[in-house]
Amino acid sequence: LSEAHALMVATHCHYHPELQEKIIFAEGIGGELMENMEPTPISNQRFDELLTEIDNLPIENKVPSINSSLPNPLAEYLDGSLDQIKWRLMGPGLYQKKLWKGQNGLKLWLLKARKGTKIPIHDHKGLEMTLVLKGSYHVEDRHYTTGMIEIAEPGLKNHQPKIDKVEDCICLVVTEAPIYLHSFIGRLMQPLIGL
């Protein structure tokens, strides 16, 4: 998994303990399979090189903020809470925080949308996964609340999430390709926004 997908899965599992149990079970099976594999011979030189590489790995001692309302994987990744984020304006009622950029247009970012905001109509060239961290939104007759993921498949047309009017909504988003905004102004702004 990419860094973006791994964080999405870990954050989603925080909201669903039954998924955490399945992952622990699958990791146990993986461990059993590795234990039963035939060992591969390795030269002393390569073994020493591997140990040196391990010794040279950076040590990260990130401790999430005690006051963080975020799931632990995301709090550790952000090294804090949502209150510390410097949001960047995307458009009326919409803000983003870019977190990670991979190859071929893969991006991990946070979206903050004011209550009652309509996301501009757009099409998807690649997969998009949106995990609700706070608040809620709906797309047609589907409603997404905290801990739920919406998966927008490549080729999805006329996608327009609408933020519920109760409170602002914050989401963790993975996009695998740029979106196509329908509005002319949106397309003009898209290079500046970076989506």
Model-derived segments and spans:
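Positively biased amphipathic helices and basic secretion/translocation or surface-docking motifs
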Residues: 3-7, 11-17, 21-83
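Charged, low-complexity intrinsically disordered boundary/linker segments
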Residues: 68-102, 106-108
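Conserved short histidine dyad/triad with adjacent acidic residue
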Residues: 94-97, 101-124, 152-157
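Glycine- and acidic-residue-biased ligand/ion/polar-headgroup-sensing regions
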Residues: 114-117, 124-139
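Short glycine/proline-enriched turns and hinge-like loops at secondary-structure junctions
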Residues: 123-125, 142-144, 163-165
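Short acidic-glycine-tyrosine-enriched beta hairpin
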Residues: 139-160
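Ligand-binding loop in jelly-roll beta-barrel domains
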Residues: 156-181
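Amphipathic alpha-helical interface segments
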Residues: 177-195
